Amino acid sequence: MGNVLAASSPPAGPPPPPAPPLVGLPPPPPSPPGFTLPPLGGGLGAGAGTGRGSERTPGTAAASAGGTADDGACGCLPNPGTFEECHRKCKELFPIQMEGVKLTVNKGLSNHFQVNHTVALSTIGESNYHFGVTYVGTKQLSPTEAFPVLVGDMDNSGSLNAQVIHQLGPGLRSKMAIQTQQSKFVNWQVDGEYRGSDFTAAVTLGNPDVLVGSGILVAHYLQSITPCLALGGELVYHRRPGEEGAVMSLAGKYTLNNWLATVTLGQAGMHATYYHKASDQLQVGVEFEASTRMQDTSVSFGYQLDLPKANLLFKGSVDSNWIVGATLEKKLPPLPLTLALGAFLNHRKNKFQCGFGLTIG
């Protein structure tokens, strides 16, 4: 979707280094104590609606079994979650590539307001500084969820990423995101999502320009067929002067107590993931991607090892391109410090990359 957003923007002269797609905005800073930021891609949390089916996720056998029994007793199916979250459970197991040195300082100014400072030093790209702000409103829907949520991030060149998320009513959530590159307005999009008892529907409008006649429209729908099976689809329509097109994809998700299988099939190719929770400490995932445009396929294996007593989180991965990577996160109580180490090795290109990070607060 990010590529289509970029394609729908009107051509311009040679700008500074291209900004990342709007959909791939950097993750927001951690929320203030006592609150949890909602998923930026949608997905309603607890307390969003009354009498609605609860979303079923793998890894909670007792809760899932109880929820399934209740749904069956009242003739209701569980909510399938959002289309954008179909592959997220597996992707979260894979380590994020690190390079250089990164220092992050988080400071909570109140229960609703937090700021953070990030300095990144790189040997490959440009070093940069980011200032981030997070505000969580007073409309509390659950002990860990409140609205509206405002997240902003600005770097040393003046480029801004900002998002506003708000719960408009039971089951209805909206989001607005903007992106600037120095003094130029690059991207903006508006999302609307409705979560029913057994389905989720979402619409995204990106970079609309009535005068030029360009823009992008994305529609998602996911429906529970059985307590374990959900089916849905995605329609992407983009238009700009001299070009117009639409791409459709179908998706299926099968969920059991401790594993989740998802497949997405469309004109661009195929994407399949498998997530398995082996124990409270170990989770594994397999990802398969096939691109019709690139005529290429790849398979990746990732795992996550969580040792709460040691305050340790380890992630590792290996793929069919012989790229091996790992990250290690270690909390250092009683100090509010988190140490992160990462390394990636590409055997085919004989390239090695490593990084070090420290988070305070």
Curated annotation (Swiss-Prot):
Transmembrane segments: none annotated. Residues 1-71 are annotated as: Disordered. The keyword Transport applies. Keywords: Membrane, Mitochondrion, Mitochondrion outer membrane, Protein transport, Transmembrane, Transmembrane beta strand, Transport. One of its GO terms (molecular function) is protein transmembrane transporter activity. Its main location: mitochondrion. Residues 40-52 have a biased composition (Gly residues). Residues 11-36 have a biased composition (Pro residues). Residues 1-10, 59-71 have a biased composition (Low complexity). GO terms for biological process: protein import into mitochondrial matrix; protein targeting to mitochondrion. The keyword Mitochondrion applies. Belongs to the Tom40 family. Forms part of the preprotein translocase complex of the outer mitochondrial membrane (TOM complex) which consists of at least 7 different proteins (TOMM5, TOMM6, TOMM7, TOMM20, TOMM22, TOMM40 and TOMM70). Interacts with mitochondrial targeting sequences. Interacts with TIMM29; linking the TIM22 complex to the TOM complex. Forms a complex with BCAP31 (via C-terminus) which mediates the translocation of components of the mitochondrial membrane respiratory chain NADH dehydrogenase (Complex I) from the cytosol to the mitochondria. This is Mitochondrial import receptor subunit TOM40 homolog. It comes from Bos taurus (Bovine).
